[in-house]
A protein has these predicted regions:
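N-terminal accessory regions of S-adenosyl-L-methionine
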Residues: 1, 18-129
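Generic hydrophobic/packing signal
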Residues: 2, 55-57, 67, 145-146, ...
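Long, low-complexity Q/N-rich tracts
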Residues: 3-21
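A short mid-domain helix/strand-loop element embedded in enzyme catalytic domains
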Residues: 113-138, 152-161
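Conserved S-adenosyl-L-methionine
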Residues: 136-182
């Protein structure tokens, strides 16, 4: 076997292993966090930093933000209940599981139950969104910002964008539980 052939076989095996890790089996018992790794978050941040022309609608940088704030975000109340409170409610979870299974088996199925649960939560309960770091960085670059004072720092998207653009950033937020995520 040639050296090049061995290398491609090894590469294929690595890719297959990565794919297996991404499409892990999910049974629907624990809350379906995205579980972004530190490596993925750093890679996403570096990708954002290296972009020269950004589309404000791009999702580049979202993993860097979600890495620090996703576990706190699910405890934020929307219409009186947080996503975690809804998840712990057996009646609400049963309805969600049924909806997720319909998504999983339906015509728009991705073949991944984990993603079906995430989609079901977003469609049935709510999504707690934040500004896209790519959009913030686009505006910072467009208006040649050198300093940013953010009175509603929120989930940290604008902070991540400022870091990616090497811009001085001061963020103020009344929610002290967000500090570890920053």
């Amino acid at each position: 076997m040639t050296r090049k052939k061995k290398k491609t076989i090894k590469t294929r095996k690595k890719m297959k292993m990565k794919r297996k890790e991404k499409t892990r089996k999910y049974r629907g018992e624990s809350y379906p966090y995205k579980n972004i790794t530190r490596t993925e978050a750093v890679a996403d941040f570096v990708n954002l930093k290296n972009q020269t022309s950004l589309n404000p609608r791009s999702v580049i940088g979202n993993n860097a933000v979600n890495y620090g704030t996703e576990k706190i975000r699910v405890h934020t109340k929307y219409r009186g209940k947080s996503l975690m409170q809804r998840w712990k409610d057996p009646v609400a979870r049963k309805k969600l599981k049924k909806f997720a299974m319909n998504l999983y088996k339906g015509s728009y199925a991705t073949g991944n139950l984990f993603h079906a649960f995430q989609s079901a939560i977003a469609l049935q309960w709510a999504t707690l969104s934040s500004m896209r770091p790519a959009a913030a960085l686009h505006f910072y670059r467009k208006y040649e910002a050198t300093h940013v004072l953010d009175f509603t720092a929120g989930w940290g998207s604008r902070m991540v964008a400022a870091m990616a653009g090497d811009i001085d950033y001061i963020g103020i937020d009344s929610n002290k539980s967000l500090r570890p995520g920053y």
